[in-house]
Amino acid sequence: MMVIPSGPIQDACCDYKSIESIQSDVFDKIQNLVKTKFFRHYRANLWKECPFWNEDALCTNRDCSVATIDEETLPLEWRKAALSAIQLPPTKGRLLMPSQQKCTYKDQDFCLVDDKLDSDHVVYIDLTENPERFTGYAGPSSARVWKAIYEENCFDIVHRMTEGCETCNNIMNLGDSSTKHRNPFAHVPKDKAELHQFLTDLAEESDGSNEDEVCLEKRVYYRLISGLHSSISIHICDEWFDQETGIWGPNLKCFVNRIGTHPERLQNVYFAYALLLRAVNKVGPYLEHYEFRTGSLKEDEKTSYLVQDLIKSTTSCPPTFDEKSMFRGSEAHVLRQEFKEHFRNVSQIMDCVGCEKCRLWGKLQTVGLGTALKVLFSYEDNSLNPITNPDLFERNEIVALFNTFNRFTESLNAIQRFRDIYLDQTSPKKEELLAENKSQSYIQPYVTKLFNQFKSWNIPLPNYIKLLI
């Protein structure tokens, strides 16, 4: 079968099979949760200026636009007038540069959340009405965003994280442009040799990383960024718009080109899922007594039940990631600060995305991963109590965390769907099987008669006849 990784997930505490099993168990639960009133409404500023370069390549495709909702229809506690106690001076639509952002985030934060910034320009969005999918946004604008992330905010380790893998290729194709990269899977694997090489790369123990050169913290950071990028690509391929038929649906060629040509990207989706799963599990006690304040007691109770039911499923398995293994030793403090600064920059770079809907989901999932990192690395287990520490997380952070977990859950589900499509395209056609069965049923009586005749003569049956039996 295509794309079935096996063995342990590098830098995590579980294997691929366990993650797929957990994903199957929680899929329906997280799907139901993100449709609730609390989790489907997200607050964002989609019109900040890009703080790093002049970005005017806005997508004009109607699929790029985001439909907002009237905030007057939402609970009072969620509205602009009910923001947290942090009051910020007006920024006139501009995002402050890092040197000016001393008051825009806490030291525990790994990213910038719109709730704390420029409250005059934020809007509410129903995420179920604005799904993440193919919009046609691509080209120089999109490439510039990812180039800035990988080249300037990834510890300069992209090359080393893909060394030693024959079919791997770093995301930006950096390096000597005169060297032609081997890319044997620009199409669906068509024979056992290609498929074997692909699966071998998936199972490679090191997947290109050199532990002597790249420390754990930097590897984890890179895997998260790559996993996010790969997950977004999977969503685009899974909900692809066929311009000829006018139908939305999965595009196998897109998936193979974006993910199948780079086995390490698939690995990193699983890794990011393992980290998110651990964060959701760890934040469970905090949400046990959390007040969702949807404006309806019945809705609050329903939301709380769905959250606890989901978290209960995550506690049924051993921890999938060990956060205590990170940021230890003499360089721990420096590494932690660099890690945060890089990830905060990534959250700002999402304001440079030229497609409104892509920007929305890029910002949300960056906040979601940032919240997961905050849960894992900023607080001990006994600190996660909403009664004694009620203001640890903004509402937006909780919404982003679970929606990001859902997006990665859907990515793993899409991988299974693409496997099935691949098998359907490469397996013998139904008509061929029927014709073969019909042919066999026609000659079988004659073969049986011949077999009995040879047996009565004590003559060994020829091999070519044995194959027909």
Q: Which positions does each model-derived feature cover?
A:
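Extended non-catalytic scaffold regions that mediate assembly and binding
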Residues: 1-469
